[in-house]
A protein has these predicted regions:
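Catalytic-site neighborhood detector that most strongly recognizes the C-terminal catalytic loop/helix
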Residues: 83-91, 103, 175, 179-200
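DNA/chromatin major-groove-contacting recognition/catalytic segments
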Residues: 7-10, 94-97, 104, 108, ...
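Short alpha-helical segment immediately N-terminal to, or the first helix within
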Residues: 55-56, 69, 160-161, 174, ...
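Short basic/aromatic active-site micro-motif
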Residues: 46-51, 127, 146-164
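Basic, Lys/Arg- and aromatic-enriched nucleic-acid-binding interface segment
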Residues: 1-63, 67, 77, 88-92, ...
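Short, polar N-cap/turn motifs at the start of nucleic acid-interacting alpha helices
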Residues: 73-80, 146-147, 166-185, 196
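C-terminal catalytic core of Y-nucleophile DNA break-rejoin enzymes
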Residues: 1, 88-108, 117-138, 149
Length: 202
């Protein structure tokens, strides 16, 4: 998918740029005898944005669910994320398996964060994010992507599952749709899956 490729490339460029800016700032501080800031090159990520976006792309979680996610709901042993009912739109807890990409990114992010049972993503004040509109808009502009909302990453996740032949009911459960009709919008993306189903009658 071209948009996904552009988005990830833009995220990588942002990481490189922020590393360069931090190096420049630390040279300035060293020359004047000020305390150096943490070296971004020794960190897995320069901030929350890249792991937050990758998590969204690989789990289909809603933005609010990502903001509310706590480490206690991330099980690295069974490779699963619990979206608890109080934070889920449907009011029901669902479990989303983590693929290798998601597992690696969250593992690296956890090592970088202070050990706590708090939120996976916290703002500079240690509080819940309300939005990431400024950084999200900037990353899209740098990628040359237009008319793409944060919620579209959720659609992208579901579309890839449908095209891979995943059962629509499984997609519904992963997305946390309370209404099956909402999941049916992805049915047209799985023609091969439907063809194989009909061939079972031969």
């Amino acid at each position: 998918d071209e948009e996904l490729k552009l988005l990830l490339e833009s995220l990588d460029r942002r990481e490189e740029r922020r590393c360069g800016e931090r190096d420049s700032a630390n040279r300035w501080r060293s020359e004047r005898g000020y305390r150096r800031l943490p070296d971004f090159k020794k960190c897995a990520f320069t901030d929350h944005l890249k792991p937050m976006i990758i998590l969204s792309l690989h789990t289909g979680m809603r933005r609010g669910e990502v903001f509310d996610l706590k480490w206690q709901h991330v099980d690295f042993t069974v490779r699963s994320i619990a979206v608890v009912g109080e934070t889920a739109k449907s009011g029901k807890t669902r479990h989303i398996p983590m693929n290798r990409t998601c597992l690696e990114v969250l593992g690296r992010w956890q090592k970088q964060c202070a050990k706590s049972s708090g939120r996976v993503f916290q703002n500079a004040d240690g509080m819940r994010f309300n939005n990431v509109k400024k950084s999200w808009t900037a990353i899209l502009e740098q990628a040359g992507i237009v008319n793409f909302r944060w919620h579209d990453m959720r659609h992208h996740f579901a579309s890839r599952l449908a095209m891979a032949g995943v059962d629509l009911n499984a997609i519904r459960e992963l997305l946390g749709h309370s209404d099956y009709e909402m999941t049916l919008r992805y049915a047209h993306l799985a023609p091969e899956h439907k063809r194989k189903a009909v061939e079972l009658l031969d």
